[in-house]
Amino acid sequence: MIREQRSSRGGSRDQRTNRRIRAREVRVVGSDGSQLGVMPLEAALDRARTEGLDLVEISPMASPPVCKIMDYGKFKYEEKKKASEAKRAQVTVLLKEVKLRPKTEEHDYEFKVRNTRRFIEDGNKAKVVIQFRGREITHREQGTAILDDVAKDLKDVAVVEQMPRMEGRLMFMILAPTPKVAQKARELVRQAATAAKRPPPPGAPGAGKSAAGASSGAEEKAEETAEEKKEAQAAPAAAEAQSPTAS
């Protein structure tokens, strides 16, 4: 599996393999993880070639560089697979905007705080905005008081990531999940990703449905064929019994 690999003009960020390794001597780790010691590069390449594998430089800064005999294509595939699984397990953090007014009714306030709580419990952030209209802008303390109430009502699940500030006629703050809530959200995402990869258990709805259906269909077909044969054999005898005797 020794392959000649030429680097592009801009170089490559991949590990050096086979003939791209520049050192004259290398410390070699076998495909089974055993230490094979220091040897000339050509000897290491011959050993990898004998096993039908690649020689991969894993510690280029060591003296001499450390190389391992492995299937480099399989190694890259596994690395890509691990990166993909890690990416699926990551929590995508969203920023939800929650709009309130200086004179928000109590039921509207409670409704929006409940929704904000659920959103934060999912591992997301919330931008709580107070909209001022007309002369309401002269009473900014009302907006500050509402934002303080929101922060207090959600203190068990959220922390203030950005303190209240003005932007035009808007006052806003940003809430983020507490470390405990964020960790729980990440764990739920990981569990969901793991469950999605598992095949359904034998007794689960739909498991083995196609095989069972095929087997049942075959049995029914066999029964129908047997019945048809019996009817075909019985038909001549019945016809002879019913026919008049020749005179």
From Swiss-Prot:
Function as written in the Swiss-Prot or TrEMBL entry: IF-3 binds to the 30S ribosomal subunit and shifts the equilibrium between 70S ribosomes and their 50S and 30S subunits in favor of the free subunits, thus enhancing the availability of 30S subunits on which protein synthesis initiation begins.
Region (Needed for vegetative and developmental functions, but not for viability): 182-247
Signal sequence range: none
Disulfide bonds: none
Entry similarity comment: Belongs to the IF-3 family.
Pfam families: IF3_C, IF3_N
Cited PANTHER family: TRANSLATION INITIATION FACTOR IF-3 (PTHR10938), TRANSLATION INITIATION FACTOR IF-3, MITOCHONDRIAL (PTHR10938:SF0)
Biased amino acid composition, Basic and acidic residues: 218-232
GO terms of molecular function: ribosome binding; translation initiation factor activity
The encoding gene: infC
HAMAP family for this protein: IF_3
Comp. bias (Low complexity): 207-217, 233-247
Region Disordered, residue ranges: 1-20, 188-247
Database matches in Gene3D superfamilies: Translation initiation factor 3 (IF-3), C-terminal domain, Translation initiation factor 3 (IF-3), N-terminal domain
Assembly: Monomer.
Keywords of this entry: Cytoplasm, Initiation factor, Protein biosynthesis
The record's note on its domains: The 66 residues C-terminal tail is not present in other species.
Compartments where found: Cytoplasm
Membrane-spanning ranges: none
Gene Ontology cellular component terms for the protein in this record: cytosol; membrane
InterPro entries linked to this entry: T_IF-3_C_sf, T_IF-3_N_sf, Translation_initiation_fac3_CS, Translation_initiation_fac_3, Translation_initiation_fac_3_C, Translation_initiation_fac_3_N
Protein name: Translation initiation factor IF-3
Coiled-coil intervals: none
